[in-house]
Amino acid sequence: MPQPEQPHTILLVHCHYRLPGGEDAVFAAECAMLQAHGHRVITYERNNDAGGLAQKLLLPLRAIYSTKTVREVRALIRKEQVDLVHVHNTLLTISPSVFQACFKEHVPAVQTLHNFRIFCPNGILMRDGHVCEECPQHGLGCAVRHSCYRGSRAQSLVCAGIYAFHRLLGTYRKVNLITLTEFDRSKLLEFNRKASRPVFTPERLYCKPNGVAAPNHSPLPWAQRKNQIVFAGRLEELKGLRTAIEAWQLLGPDAPQLIVAGTGPLEAWAKENAPDTVTFTGQLPHGTLTELLAQSRAALC
């Protein structure tokens, strides 16, 4: 693999979800890719386990601005002589205050936007099964009114407060932002134009699809593949698992085998309602999953 003319020291920042998901996989893959290309990678990671009662009571404030994050990231930047900070998820325990550490240390910062959360607290522009753009058009308070974040008005207030506060600080206007698709980029530019005050700097918004490491297992010739389809991802409404299970119910006993790989809140419902043509594997190691995909006819991801 070609090496860079001048390797850099890159700090990757990510707050892991309680249930492993795509953002976690992208974070790990990007870390490996940068290292493979000769860069020195440092990571700053947390999870969303708030700990004891005192920590849970302080979490709403720390989710908005974490002095711990600022202090630790500044120290890490100085100690490791970091050239660039690349942020993935900051919700909840890292907080966007990580960027203040970058600003204070005069280190460039970039964030990959895996969702629309800077305009929509639930991140997906959906409510009650329909497209919803109320927050981009009428303000973040709409999410609080509809309890959009985790079905909780209190948690929605915290989430909306995070982005409202950092709009006031102008945090995202100083950060380079990456979207995963041109559609995402166009929607964010549209929302930014309609905002009473720009949330980010348009010239700092770029599109870079997620990279994927070359699989160890090449796909088998079509004739040699098993009559099966793989559903891989977090088992939740957003990923379309309910639709897939209902489709397999309609297809009947002649349907190809659907192999569901992953865990999530919809798992119990799916197992209860799945026909015999659906099997569940739980969370699979990456190598096992790629081998399974290589011998299957299609994937639902």
Question: Which positions does each model-derived feature cover?
Answer:
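Conserved active-site histidine-acidic residue motif and adjacent donor-binding/catalytic loop
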Residues: 67, 264-267, 278-293
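Donor nucleotide-sugar binding/catalytic pocket of nucleotide-sugar-dependent glycosyltransferases
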Residues: 118, 133, 137-217, 280-281
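Conserved donor-binding/catalytic core segment of Leloir-type glycosyltransferases
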Residues: 178, 212, 216, 221-239, ...
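Acidic donor-binding loop of glycosyltransferase active sites
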Residues: 294-301
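Short N-terminal targeting/anchoring amphipathic segment
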Residues: 12, 74-94, 108-117
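Glycosyltransferase donor-sugar binding loop
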Residues: 47-48, 232-235, 257-270, 274
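Short donor-sugar binding/catalytic loops of nucleotide-sugar-dependent glycosyltransferases
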Residues: 16-18, 211, 232-242, 264, ...
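N-terminal subdomain of nucleotide-sugar transferases
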Residues: 1-47, 78-80, 98-108, 249
